[in-house]
Amino acid sequence: MRKLRAGIVGCSGIANDKHLPAIQRNGNFEITAFCDLFEERAQTAKETYGTPDARVYTDYRELLKEDLDVVYVLTPNSTHAEVSIAAMESGKHVMCEKPMAKTYAEAKAMVDVAHRTGKVLNIGYQCRYRADAQYLKQA
């Protein structure tokens, strides 16, 4: 089975602490593109987690021109909708870090684009099954 080609938009904090190590351990992905406003962060992520021919960008729109299966959106919360929508419109599936968006309207736009394009939009709500989250849900 072919590995999925992943692009990473946002290469600090949560990317290095959680997502990139997990993607690397998974074994079903190859990370072939990295983007961050600070090129050195993207370059460091590439050297640690990328394929030998992985490319580095400072503009996510350039990364979206790559032949990718999925884009991980690990950017500041205020940019989640913009980047996710652009990724789906360019033919990529999206894994977006939480929160999904700033407003209901942005979140709805993301879902609408996912339906229109047929792309998977996954939001990283990984805490919903923790004991404290389940307790609050039942309260």
Language-model features: locations:
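Beta-loop-alpha module in the N-terminal Rossmann-like domain of NAD(P)-dependent dehydrogenases
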Residues: A54-A109, V113
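Hydrophobic residues in well-ordered beta-strands that form the structural core
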Residues: A15, T58, C96, L121-I123
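N-terminal Rossmann-like dinucleotide-binding module
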Residues: M1-G50
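A contiguous active-site-proximal alpha/beta segment in oxidoreductase catalytic domains
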Residues: A101-A139
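Short, conserved SAM-binding/catalytic segment
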Residues: T44-D53, A109, V113-T117
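Short, well-ordered coil/turn segments that N-cap beta-strands
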Residues: F29, A54, K92, T117-V120
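Short alpha-helical
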Residues: I14, E40-R41, S78-A81, K102-A105, ...
